[in-house]
Structures are given as C-alpha cells and as structure tokens.
Amino acid sequence: MTAPSLAPPRLIVGLGNPGRDYEETRHNAGFWFCARLAQAWGAALAHESRFHGIVGRHGTRWMLLPQTFMNRSGQAVGALARFHRIAPAEILVVHDELDIPPGQLRLKFGGGMGGHNGLKDITAHLGTQDYWRLRIGIGHPGDRSEVVNYVLKPPRREEQADIDAAIERALGLLPLIEKGEWNAATQRANSKPASPKSQETP
C-alpha cells in the first residue's frame, strides 16, 4: 500500500443495491449517506447511463451511486473515474461494514476489503486498493451463514437510529475531508461515539 493521499476527494461513491426491494436494507448504508450528502450539497441527482449510476455534482466534486448491483460497483466507479481523470487516491467509497457495531464509523486508506463484494469489484476495476473508504457499521449477525440474509434485511428500529446518527457524524467529517485534513477526520471518525442507544438497551 502506498502512503495515504492527503488530497481532497474528487469522487464520493455510496455503495448499495438499486431498486425498491433494497432501499431499506443494511447493505444500502452507502446510498443512505449519499442521499443525505446530496441534501447537504443541494445537489440534483440524475441517472447517467454512461457511468452506470446516479450522479451528482457539487463544484469540482462528484457523487456516484452505482446502479449495477453491489458486486459490479466497479463498473460504474471505473467508468466515471476514467472519464473525469480521477485518480484512485482521490476517491472516497462509503459502504456498510459488518465488523463494526451500528452507530460507529471507520475511515481508512487502502487495505483489505473484508469480504465486501462492492470493494472487491472496485479494486479490480481501479487496479489498486489505494483509495479511501468510510465504513458505516451495521453489526454482524454472529453466524457467517446468516450474513447474506442479514445485509439484505432492514435494520431493527434501534439499529436504524444508531446508523442514522453515524451518518450524521460522517457528514460532519466533510469539512475536514474537503480541506484534505484526513488525519483529523480519521481520528474523529474512528473515535467511539458517546453512549450509542443500542448499547443502552438491556
């Protein structure tokens, strides 16, 4: 892995699956983040077939929600990145993370993909693992055989509240990230939030 890029991102990608059947499922946490980011940016989102996804723009920054289904996300990311000459290190991918409890975040550059099929395909299309990832915790079902069923179901109410709170915290990182202050953003993202609601429930 190369040293982390400190350049602000030119492309923010939210991962998920298209269609109403998947809108409220855990695997769509990246889409949820981008929906809130589009509101914050005041950006209009439109489907662009050449990029295989829904695209928004804010100044010189792009947002992409691939509409290819999760395991082909790289097709969309690669197409937009090549067209606009965006380097992998200038890309931030926002996705759900099984190994983190609901309500928590992790920001990191490069590294492994943790079995996430969306990241695997993006890495294959970019030819490198060296891009930024913002991981939104959705928790783990406890049994590997239950993972597919788990990520394709909606969170419980208390989990949804924690995930929504984490997304708001993630939006709060953007002023740092947009200035290239990745170290400060990483420290803030990776710090444990105070008293997540789901942990207070007996």
Curated annotation (Swiss-Prot):
Catalytic activity: an N-acyl-L-alpha-aminoacyl-tRNA + H2O = an N-acyl-L-amino acid + a tRNA + H(+)
Site keyed Stabilizes the basic form of H active site to accept a proton: positions: 96
Alphabetized PANTHER family for the sequence: PEPTIDYL-TRNA HYDROLASE
TM annotation in the entry: none
Site feature Discriminates between blocked and unblocked aminoacyl-tRNA, where: 17
Record's protein name: Peptidyl-tRNA hydrolase
Function: Hydrolyzes ribosome-free peptidyl-tRNAs (with 1 or more amino acids incorporated), which drop off the ribosome during protein synthesis, or as a result of ribosome stalling.
Subunit structure: Monomer.
GO BP: protein quality control for misfolded or incompletely synthesized proteins; rescue of stalled ribosome
GO-annotated cellular components: cytoplasm
GO MF term list: peptidyl-tRNA hydrolase activity; tRNA binding
Catalytic site: 27 (proton acceptor)
Pfam families recorded: Pept_tRNA_hydro
Keywords: Cytoplasm, Hydrolase, RNA-binding, tRNA-binding
Binding-site residues, tRNA: 22, 69, 71, 117
Family from the record: Belongs to the PTH family.
Organism: Thiobacillus denitrificans (strain ATCC 25259 / T1)
InterPro entries: Pept_tRNA_hydro, Pept_tRNA_hydro_CS, Pept_tRNA_hydro_sf
Compartment annotation: Cytoplasm
E.C. numbers: 3.1.1.29
